[in-house]
Amino acid sequence: MVSTPPTLLMLFDDGDAGPSTGLVHREKSDAVNEEAHATSVPPHAPPQTLWLLDNFNIEDSYDRDAGPSTGPVHRERSDAVNEEAHATSIPPHAPPQTLWLLDNFNIEDSYDRDAGPSTSPIDREASHEVNEDAHATSAPPHVMVSPLQNRRPFDQFNNQPYDASAGPSTGPGKRGRGRPKGSKNGSRKPKKPKAYDNNSTDASAGPSSGLGKRRCGRPKGLKNRSRKPKKPKADDPNSKMVISCPDFDSRITEAERESGNQEIVDSILMRFDAVRRRLCQLNYRKDKILTASTNCMNLGVRTNMTRRIGPIPGVQVGDIFYYWCEMCLVGLHRNTAGGIDSLLAKESGVDGPAATSVVTSGKYDNETEDLETLIYSGHGGKPCDQVLQRGNRALEASVRRRNEVRVIRGELYNNEKVYIYDGLYLVSDCWQVTGKSGFKEYRFKLLRKPGQPPGYAIWKLVENLRNHELIDPRQGFILGDLSFGEEGLRVPLVNEVDEEDKTIPDDFDYIRSQCYSGMTNDVNVDSQSLVQSYIHQNCTCILKNCGQLPYHDNILVCRKPLIYECGGSCPTRMVETGLKLHLEVFKTSNCGWGLRSWDPIRAGTFICEFTGVSKTKEEVEEDDDYLFDTSRIYHSFRWNYEPELLCEDACEQVSEDANLPTQVLISAKEKGNVGRFMNHNCWPNVFWQPIEYDDNNGHIYVRIGLFAMKHIPPMTELTYDYGISCVEKTGEDEVIYKGKKICLCGSVKCRGSFG
């Protein structure tokens, strides 16, 4: 046999194939090679793959993450195995191993020092002894070396791991089991653990050896790193939120705060809306509604705080609300977020809860079979089945208890949500259905109690009138348009008191704007005000109105002694725009003709101008029932916002009393508009506001605008205070009002006379 030069053959185990005996020394590989050539009939052995590697770095061949390993074989252990192999004629069967042909191998790099326990690489002198023993053996063991199947340059090898247990393969195999995904057979430097704050971890999460994936028990979003404490937000100097104000007088007693009346309810709603309008005028960037309602609650501007079943003192059937928080402020619906309000068991006085009020917002599958019935959808669900708890449980309990439930219906008007109080209902039935979302939902049937004034029914009536203009077939219809085309909207005339009476009002000429009897009503305004620099589209409204426009979204913000409006094309003018509401003249039961609206009217809305003929005292007739006189005595009331509710100085309070330098007299007896049909009331829902008007011709006039004092439901009579001529004092606090006519308004504040 021709001897061959020694060739370095290395047996490698894949880290995933199980425990390995480590790396065989070079001289031992030479002995095995020579014995293999001397054997004529080699014994059967599993095929092995032979690879030729140049300049191979053995350190890259071992993966320290492959699992437990004994590291490179110790010298004594390697010698014992070698001697036993030479003494055996038939070598024992061993699992298939990969045979690598290595040149220029550096044994010092043949193991990873971090792989675990190891006896260090085999000494070279010890390897010589093993080699000499192998050559001295007379019967060398038969080892079969399969032919070289695949020779691949090392640069194409890419250090792909190979699983010896996978069977024969002609190339690198797929990553074996147990090796971490993405690991490579390269030398790795030990990673230094990152510093982290032990205080930032949860002690219940268990021990951890370092930075890793969040384990069970660790708070969601928590990371093993130190965090800088968050700095508290600085107070916003422009914030209008009020927490407390010791000097503020809410003008509401503790008893009135627990249980109110109509005067208190009206006052609270007007005060809240005044704050909201002021925030709109200031262009307050934060939530205006939330700020206004929170300030009112914090400073005690609220009533009916006691939860109760049944009617709410001061709230009438048919009253409207433009914001959810308004219902909370007056105690109609105390739940600030849910559509079902209820009493707890301890509050109701019996076992179990009881529903007190429900609000239909239009977002759910509520149905109305008729104007006296409501099918109400329970709360909860989406994306799960509704359960019988909280509000649903309270409504279900009300079926058995038969207690009254207040119903507030939400409707859209001009893209705004309006809530109508529809009175008291009884919950008659409860069942479950599958809703549009595919989940179980509760349904409750509510029946309206008879004998109540109409609420929601009025809303649906005027909705049909506005949308379809069903005027002619109406009960008591007389005339389709009392303005005879002068107004942009028709003004119908109806008499529902006596359908047989088709008499129309006294003969008069309908006019849209003020008529002056050959005189200029000069109010002695400084002439320099007419030569001001243009600020807002060539008008001087801002400067004349103390630097702020009087309107926001066509709503009056504050009452003032005098409001200035430019003529011509000024975009802020209101008087010259004409009617924007669907008004109608109707016959009242005891006060002649009256005026009402098909539309809901928000507080501060311009209704119409009181038009007529401007006169002097000498020109006024004694029996003129259609005379407007600014010199009369009027009941004072507070309508503007309170500075304390907006973190403003109390001295910034705007005066509301009219202070005209000259008396304004307007007679609508012969010429006028719909304003002439507005009746007197000692507790009105409309107030008048003097407006200075410039016709751009050097003439300045004072005109009278009529604005809504509070939210007015549709088909509610519109009234304002006519005032009285004189007052006699009978004591320090007692006065006698001496008007020309007897008052029949019937309000709780009726003075007995007017005019």
UniProtKB/Swiss-Prot annotation:
EC main group: transferase
Domain spans labelled Pre-SET: 528-578
GO biological process, one term: regulation of cell size
Record's catalysed reaction(s): N(6)-methyl-L-lysyl(9)-[histone H3] + S-adenosyl-L-methionine = N(6),N(6)-dimethyl-L-lysyl(9)-[histone H3] + S-adenosyl-L-homocysteine + H(+); L-lysyl(9)-[histone H3] + S-adenosyl-L-methionine = N(6)-methyl-L-lysyl(9)-[histone H3] + S-adenosyl-L-homocysteine + H(+)
Annotated Polar residues bias: 197-207
Metal-binding recorded as keyword: yes
Entry's localization field: Nucleus; Chromosome, Centromere
Similarity comment: family membership: Belongs to the class V-like SAM-binding methyltransferase superfamily. Histone-lysine methyltransferase family. Suvar3-9 subfamily.
Domain remark from Swiss-Prot or TrEMBL: Although the SET domain contains the active site of enzymatic activity, both pre-SET and post-SET domains are required for methyltransferase activity. Cys residues in the pre-SET domain normally bind 3 zinc ions that are arranged in a triangular cluster, but here these Cys residues are only partially conserved, suggesting that the pre-Set domain may not bind a zinc cluster.
Name of protein: Histone-lysine N-methyltransferase, H3 lysine-9 specific SUVH8
